[in-house]
């Protein structure tokens, strides 16, 4: 049997009121667990999200029949701004330490959010975390999600940097793939 694989899930949420986003997280965890069993390779999951909630984490484990020791919710909201990172150095160091443990990251951006239409704070926060992952040299897979629109040219350039540095990029729909093809050479799966 191979060593345990540690997968970081970014933009996949457990502690969220949007049940569609939580369902997306459940779906990917369920698929990864099937792959884990087929390959006889145990997987530990670090779910990087805004805030952690141990009760919701336990409920997801129970629902998916996954051991609680396999899924850890790791808060990331403090990584959204430099000022927050400075104000919370211990929390920041703990999060970065957990990020470095990951063999690979899969980013879902909650399925439909790799865009700046939800505001600059949210775009910068999520995108900065992706850039940090890539800067650490950890493979980043952009899972099925929508891309764009980007209302600001600087945001489109920042997104392009993430997309082109990613190990693998998947679009949720043809429209998103075509949108990104207008500003990036990266090919989708």
Where is each model-derived feature located?
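Active-site-proximal region of nucleotide-activated glycan assembly enzymes
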Residues: 123-127, 131-189
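Aromatic- and Gly/Pro-rich donor/ligand-binding loops
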Residues: 2-150
